[in-house]
Amino acid sequence: MSTLVMPDPFSGIESFPLLEMDYFGLTENQLNKLPPKQRLEEMIKIIKHSDDESQRWDSICLCGELYHVLDRGDHDLSNVDSLQMKTHIKDLFRWILKNEKNGVVLHEVCYHIAARNIRELIPDLVTCGVCSDSILGRHEAIESLGLMNAQEVMDEIRKALDDPVRDVRETAEFVLKRLRRYKNETYEGLQII
């Protein structure tokens, strides 16, 4: 049994050489043809270094799908490899919530956190929902907390009732109503068919 030896994608980020734009020309289909470990490494590089938000968005979608496959155990990787890759994806999603400037990309990562029920990132979603410069990001972070039935952060979500943007306030109102209705329910993540 081999163990995944994957360099820490979050150390020495500033030391990465500037990569050729052709490198970032990888499409979703090309990335999907790579073995899972290599695919994750490439997606991390794209998310951290591409100036094309559509490429970062694609990579987030693929990371979410990969997380889902790893979580289900429907793969040929060892448990150690699978756990390590899931940890890298969670760390990457947390990094995106803190660093992404594009609202559409931020929206997408919030969705994938909720769809995969990555509860360790609830505090990061709260921060995004209350503090992000992106209206779209604040909206989706709050909506994602509602989808995840994050009862434990209702007080923090209430802060968004004072958001200067009507759509964000409406999202907070909606989510708080939903959380009250689902108080005794458990969220298990979206089922991907």
Q: Language-model features: where?
A:
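Alpha-helix N-cap/helix-start positions at coil->helix boundaries
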Residues: D52-S54, N102-V104, S134-L136, R166-D167
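Intrinsically disordered, serine/threonine- and proline-rich low-complexity regions
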Residues: M1-G25, N29
